[in-house]
Regions:
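Acidic, glycine-rich active-site loops and adjacent beta-strand->loop/helix elements
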Residues: 59, 85-86, 105-106, 126, ...
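C-terminal auxiliary extensions adjacent to catalytic cores
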Residues: 2-34, 38-46, 72, 147, ...
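FAD-binding core of FAD-dependent oxidoreductases
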Residues: 53-75, 82-105, 133-155, 164, ...
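Conserved, non-catalytic sequence blocks in retroelement Pol enzymes and Pol-derived host proteins
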Residues: 111, 140-142, 373
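Glycine-rich, flexible loop motifs
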Residues: 1-49, 76-134, 236
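Polyanion/phosphate-binding surface patch
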Residues: 50, 65, 249-250
Length: 502
């Protein structure tokens, strides 16, 4: 049964990700009332002729142009048309759903003043997987993405459903809905705020939270194969370093490797291991710490009002506030930090891959080939990992520093939160592939071990899951299919179950 998440006060990043993956969204009565109350304030502002940005004025550099009441609905409509200028491949279904969920959450705070029927139409589209086609590029913050969503509400634009594209008008008709006629402020609210960034950022933090466990599992398997020493993840020496993430990684490794006879065989054979093994708690732990910090920022932003202007007061005493809550500076910085952390996690995984396949250090058949020389084995898949790590370094350049000036000097500082979140997701794609390569190599290395000593129970379990998906690499064959199979395993399952205790 598909779960339903009821929006009462705020949505968390976990909830946004769940909705993007298919959970249904509903409004509580309190949330509905907040939306109704805020709209009554906007109507009062319009009735009294109180000037409010984007309500009865132009936008951007045209903010001082007063718009007559008869033209305010046209302003809302025209904003969607003029701002629908995104380019590039459309966002995926999950990304679009995350943005829409974050958008609805922003309106439900009760400071935007958009009508309830607009929000309910967004929910109907989202819950029925009738998702607007959003060009992925062309936004320094949010405008073009939001406009693509808004077009569908008025019967324009396009939607994607069951792999097919339909017109916005047909999408609404399929749900028994009619195109909306937007009122004052609604066009601006639909393109405004940080939902694009918070939606994508919610996906990023949840995806990295999933992959850090797989990274620990991959490292544990590499530890066994390479005869690593156990002191670097022992509880007492790790306690000397103050980091929640580091302590968690140490605990995970101790649990994953408990009872490993294979690892016990290597005890004391080296004074210390190379950093790609010895520093796993420190690097993986730092990534976990960065993830916790980024998640805190994303959840804080989801709990915040990011519309401009915001409305408050009451119909008897309406107030409108022009501020910069739509600026996503905190999100941009957080996503840049998360992107760098994910790139670092991929980098240390690639170094472990090299040690698994490199005959100079592995103690295993060269490049994990069963017939070295005639067969190249895992030689070039390590090059693939190195290429992805190099790409990550380029992607990890901070988007939040890109700057720029738009809208006739009115928007003269840009924080690029949405591009920062988008490139963090691109880095996570590469990280997932690199981890899949390490896990595939680690399973191959286990099969080629000369020792008959047994693996830890948990690494044995992970090995069996890998082998259920991909067989031993006996003769050279195209490896990209194997890696894709392991990527699917990483996407769809957890590294271990809660009952296993890591």
């Amino acid at each position: 049964m598909v779960p339903t998440i009821t929006l009462d006060t705020v949505l968390t990043s976990d909830a946004i990700a769940a909705i993007a993956e298919g959970a249904k969204l509903a409004l509580s009565e309190k949330a509905r009332q907040r939306i109704l109350d805020a709209r009554a304030i906007v109507d009062a502002l319009v009735d009294r002729g109180i000037r409010g940005y984007g309500i009865n004025t132009g936008v951007g550099a045209l903010c001082d142009v007063v718009i007559d009441r008869e033209e305010q609905a046209s302003l809302s409509r025209n904003l969607l048309f003029s701002h629908s200028c995104g380019v590039g491949e459309p966002l995926g279904r999950v990304e679009t759903g995350a943005i829409m969920a974050a958008q609805i959450a922003n309106f439900a705070h009760g400071y935007s003043g958009i009508r309830l029927e607009v929000v309910e139409t967004l929910i109907a589209l989202l819950n029925n997987d009738m998702l607007p086609v959003i060009p992925s590029r062309g936004s320094v913050g949010y405008l073009t993405h939001g406009a693509a969503i808004g077009l569908v509400l008025i019967g324009s634009g396009e939607c994607s459903h069951d792999g097919k594209q339909v017109s916005g008008a047909d999408a609404l008709a399929a749900l028994g809905l009619k195109p909306l006629v937007l009122q004052a402020k609604e066009g601006l609210s639909l393109i405004n705020g940080t939902p694009c960034a918070t939606g994508l950022a919610s996906l990023a933090v949840n995806r990295l939270a999933h992959l850090v466990d797989w990274a620990d599992a991959a490292a544990a398997m590499s530890y066994e194969n390479l005869g690593a020493q156990t002191d670097p993840f022992a509880e007492m020496p790790l306690s000397l370093r103050k980091s929640d993430g580091l302590q968690q990684v140490g605990k995970n490794l101790r649990t994953l490797l408990a009872g490993s006879a294979l690892l016990a065989e290597s005890a004391g054979k080296r004074t210390q291991d190379p950093l790609s093994l010895r520093a796993v708690p420190h690097v993986h732990g730092a990534v976990r710490d960065a993830l916790a910090e980024a998640r805190a920022v994303v959840d804080r932003e989801l709990a915040s009002v990011t519309d401009n202007p915001a409305v408050s007061g009451s119909p008897a005493d309406p107030k409108v506030h022009s501020q910069a809550h739509a600026v996503g500076a905190a999100l941009g910085l957080a996503m840049d930090h998360l992107a760098t952390a994910a790139a670092e996690l991929a980098a240390i995984s690639e170094r472990r891959i090299d040690r698994l396949v490199n005959p100079l250090v592995s103690g295993l058949p060269a490049f994990l080939a069963s017939g070295s020389g005639v067969e190249s084995g895992f030689m070039i898949i390590q090059s693939t990992a190195a290429a992805l790590v190099a790409e990550n370094r380029r992607l990890a350049m901070p988007a939040s520093l890109d700057g720029g000036i738009t809208s006739g000097l009115q928007e003269d500082i840009l924080t690029h939160a949405t591009p920062a979140a988008a490139k963090a997701l691109a880095i996570l794609d590469n990280l997932e592939t690199v981890l899949a390569i390490e896990l595939t190599a680690a399973a191959q290395a286990h099969d080629l071990q000369s020792s008959k000593a047994t693996k830890a129970a948990m690494t044995q379990g992970i090995y069996e899951r890998l082998r259920h998906v991909v067989p031993f690499y006996r003769d050279d064959r195209p490896m990209n299919g194997d890696i894709q199979q392991i990527r699917t395993l990483l996407k769809t399952t957890t590294a271990w179950s809660e009952s296993e205790g890591a």
